[in-house]
Curated annotation (Swiss-Prot):
One Pfam family cited in the UniProt record for this chain: Toxin_cobra-type
GO cellular component, one term: extracellular region
Species whose genome carries this gene: Tropidechis carinatus (Australian rough-scaled snake)
Tissue-by-tissue expression: Expressed by the venom gland.
Subcellular location: Secreted
Cystine bridges: C24-C43, C38-C60, C62-C73, C74-C79
Keywords, comma-separated and alphabetical: Acetylcholine receptor inhibiting toxin, Disulfide bond, Ion channel impairing toxin, Neurotoxin, Postsynaptic neurotoxin, Secreted, Signal, Toxin
Role of this protein: Binds to muscle nicotinic acetylcholine receptor (nAChR) and inhibit acetylcholine from binding to the receptor, thereby impairing neuromuscular transmission.
SUPFAM superfamilies: Snake toxin-like
Protein name: Short neurotoxin 2
Family under the similarity heading: Belongs to the three-finger toxin family. Short-chain subfamily. Type I alpha-neurotoxin sub-subfamily.
A molecular function (GO) term: ion channel regulator activity
Amino acid sequence: MKTLLLTLVVVTIVCLDLGYTMTCCNQQSSQPKTTTPCAESSCYKKTWKDHRGTIIERGCGCPNVKPGIDLMCCRTDECNN
C-alpha cells in the first residue's frame, strides 16, 4: 500500500511538473545565444538606438521602460531570442 501511495505521489509530481522554471535568453545585442532559468513567468526583449547603433537587451520578467525603448514581453521558453 505504501509503495502504491509513493508511486502516485511521484507520478503526480512528474505530471504537474512542480519544479518547472521558465528559461529566457539573456544575451545582449549580437552576442552568442545564452539562456538563464527564471523565477518570473515571462521574458523580455528591449530594443533602442544610440550612438553605437541598435542595442538589444534580453532577460527575465517584463520591466517598465522609458519612452523611446521598444519592449516585447512573452511567456514561453526562449521566446525573447
